[in-house]
C-alpha cells in the first residue's frame, strides 16, 4: 500500500491543478525519496498531461539527472554559475551532445529568490541584458526572478543573497527606472516566438570565434526550416568584435554546396545581408546592444549539393566548438 503521506501530498497537488495551476516549482526535490516523485508525477500527469514539474535542485549532476529521469519536466541548471566562453561551451556540450540530451530539459534562470549571482552584483545594465540574451537563446526555457529586469542586485556582504530579499519583506519597486530592460526581454521573447530553433537547447553548434569575450553559435531545427545565428558579447563594459567561422554542417543542413552564400536577416533589420563563405565578422557594443540574432537562409541562386549516396550518415549532431 502507498504511504498515507504520499497520497496526501498527491491530493494537495491535485487540489491546485483543479484550481487551474499547471506549473509546479518543487523546492529541493533531491531531499525527498525518488520513488515518491516517480509515482506522484506519473499519477498527476496521467490525469493531467499538461502539468509541468520544475525541479529546483542545485545539487550533484547525477542527482539532477536522476530527478529528470523519474519524471520532472524541467530542471534548474548550473547556468547561473557559468560565466566564461569556455564554461558555456563545455556545459552546453554536456547537455546537448552527451547522455542528458535524451532526458534532461534545462530551464536557464538568470537569478532566483535565493541566488543573486556575483556577476550581477552592482553590475551595469548591459550585464543584465547579456545574461538575459544568453539564457533566452541557449535554452528552450528560461526565467528571471522579480527585480532582475530593473537591475536589482545589491547583495549581503560576501554572499550570493539579496540584501533586501523579498522572502523576508514586502518590496515596493520603481518599475520606471531608467535601467529597466523590459524592452530587451520582450525583444528576446519575440525572437523565440518567431524562430522555433530558439525553443529548444538542442540543434546547437558553436562557431569558432577569435575573441574569448564573444560567444557565437548557430541553432537549427532538424529539418533546417528554422536556422539562427547568435553572437553575444560577454563584456558589459567595452565594445568587442570577433571574426567567427561557421561550421560546414550549416551548409550540409541546407543541402548547399559548402560555402555558398547565405542571407542573414538581423532581427528588426529591413534588409538581409549576404554572408559569403565560412568566415564572418561581428562587432558588439554593450552600451547599444551586446548581442545580435540573425535568421539564416540560402541566398537565391545558391548552388545545391549533390544528393548524398545511400548509406552516407553525415549529418550535424550535437554541439561542438
Regions found by a protein language model. Give the residues of each.
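Active-site region of glycoside hydrolase catalytic domains
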Residues: 1, 101-107, 132-140
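Active-site neighborhood of glycoside hydrolase catalytic domains
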Residues: 1-64
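Non-transmembrane alpha-helical segments in soluble domains
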Residues: 13-17, 41, 132-136, 185-189
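Conserved, mostly hydrophobic/aromatic
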Residues: 16, 26, 53, 113, ...
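Structural preference for beta-strand elements that scaffold enzyme active sites
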Residues: 23-25, 50-54, 73-75, 105-108, ...
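Active-site beta-loop-alpha junctions enriched in small/polar residues
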Residues: 29-31, 56-60, 81, 110-112, ...
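Carbohydrate-interacting/catalytic domains
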Residues: 38, 46-48, 61, 65-73, ...
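Active-site clefts of carbohydrate-active enzymes
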Residues: 100-125
